[in-house]
Structures are given as C-alpha cells and as structure tokens.
C-alpha cells in the first residue's frame, strides 16, 4: 500500500467565515484527489458552478508542482522579473499591473489574437539595449513566449505568477 498526500490551498478574505474557508479548501482537496494517483495539490480557484467560467483551478501532482511550477517557473520569474520586494537593476521591471495583465492574457489564451497580444505586451516591456535589465528582458521574452504556447507550461506559469501576486498584494486587496 502506498500512502498519498493530497491538499487544497485556498486564499480567502480575512472577513470570510471559517466555515466557508473549510468548505472551499475541502472542494480544492477533492479536486486534488481527482487527479490520477491522487498525491496532488489544488489551489486558489474554488471549483463551483458559480465560479468564473474561464478560470480553472490549478491542480498538480506534487512532483510537477515542486519541479515545474516552483523549481522552474517561479524560480525563473524571481530571478529575472523585478517586482515589489524583488527589485534589482538587472531584473526586468514588472509591477503588479504588468503581472495581472500577463496573468489575464495567459488565462485568455484561446486563439492567435491573444498570442499576438501577449507578444505585444512582452515587446512593450523592452528596456533600452544598454540597460542592465536588457539581458533579463531577452530571457523573459524567450521563455514566456515559449511557455505561452505550451498548455501545461502556460498553466504552470499562471500558478507561479499567482504565487508572486499573492505575495506582493497589499492588505485589503
């Protein structure tokens, strides 16, 4: 017999009743257990009929979450994007608005027009060629454009960006 561990992680408003938080994380845990082999994590989106139709709950096996989401996508973003609390002259500036816009374009990736919008957004981020952040920009442009075109990598990148956004959100947001 193999022991498996499934988890549901939800982020709620501080005024949300504990019973509602428990219900929501229970639904997330059930979503994680629906993965083949269980042993998974589901986070953020609460699966329900009332939820936004285009939003999907992030659900991964632990290995994929640790290696692909955190180990690759999140680590890459932390290294090359400069956001609140993670600024450096050699990082590409990406404020909260840019991160949200990026996340929305990744979420709406149904056709070529959105790929063009994503490429345009990346192009608008280009710093001057003599900027210390230019090398970071080149790496970000190449990686994010490639990840956008792969469904699994795009979902992993969305989760990594959500983790960053939740980290930099201010109280009350």
Protein language model features and the residues they cover:
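Charged, helix-rich terminal subdomains or tails
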Residues: 1-173
């Amino acid at each position: 017999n193999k022991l498996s561990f499934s988890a549901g992680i939800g982020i709620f408003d501080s005024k949300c009743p504990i019973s509602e938080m428990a219900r929501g994380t229970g639904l997330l845990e059930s979503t994680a257990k629906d993965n083949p082999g269980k042993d998974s994590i589901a986070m953020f989106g609460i699966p329900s009929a009332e939820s936004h139709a285009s939003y999907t709950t992030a659900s991964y096996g632990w290995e994929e979450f640790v290696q692909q989401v955190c180990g690759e996508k999140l680590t890459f973003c932390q290294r090359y994007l400069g956001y609140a609390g993670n600024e450096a002259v050699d990082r590409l500036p990406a404020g909260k608005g840019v991160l949200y816009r990026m996340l929305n374009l990744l979420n709406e990736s149904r056709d070529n027009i959105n790929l063009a919008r994503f490429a345009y957004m990346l192009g608008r981020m280009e710093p001057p060629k003599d900027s210390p952040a230019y090398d970071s920009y080149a790496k970000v442009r190449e990686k994010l454009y490639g990840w956008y075109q792969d469904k699994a990598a795009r979902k992993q990148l969305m989760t990594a960006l959500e983790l960053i956004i939740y980290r930099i959100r201010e109280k009350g947001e």
